Regions:
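Intrinsically disordered, low-complexity regulatory regions of eukaryotic proteins
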Residues: 1-108, 112
Length: 113
């Protein structure tokens, strides 16, 4: 196992996250940051369909990788388990918000009609 690439972090990178080069803590922080950015981006409901598909793919991919990491047999402290669960909730909420925004502003509908 290698060390986390985050500045100043000496934690080891689990096998499932080696391609990311991040420890579990920094991986979850990165997901949370990206989700916050995407949530702001999609809040208006005017996100292009292609971008919506990218976000849905991101949510699924990150969720799958996080699940694989969390269930790999590592002995994790309770605080890190809670952080992982919170990150799953963040991913789920982003997807739900994307769906809700799309319902409020269906693609192809224009203002003033």
């Amino acid at each position: 196992m290698s060390s986390c690439s985050a500045s100043g972090c000496k934690a080891t990178v689990p096998v499932a996250l080696e391609a990311e080069k991040l420890c579990i803590l920094h991986f979850t922080m990165e997901i949370e940051r990206h989700c916050a950015e995407m949530r702001r981006e999609t809040a208006t409901g005017r996100t292009a369909r292609e971008r919506q598909v990218e976000i849905i793919t991101y949510v699924g991919g990150r969720g799958e990788l996080l699940a694989r990491t969390a269930t790999s047999g590592l002995h994790l402290p309770d605080e890190l388990k809670a952080r992982i669960l919170n990150t799953f909730l963040t991913l789920m909420n982003l997807r739900e918000n994307l769906d809700r925004a799309a319902l409020r502003h269906p693609i192809g509908r224009t203002e003033g009609r």
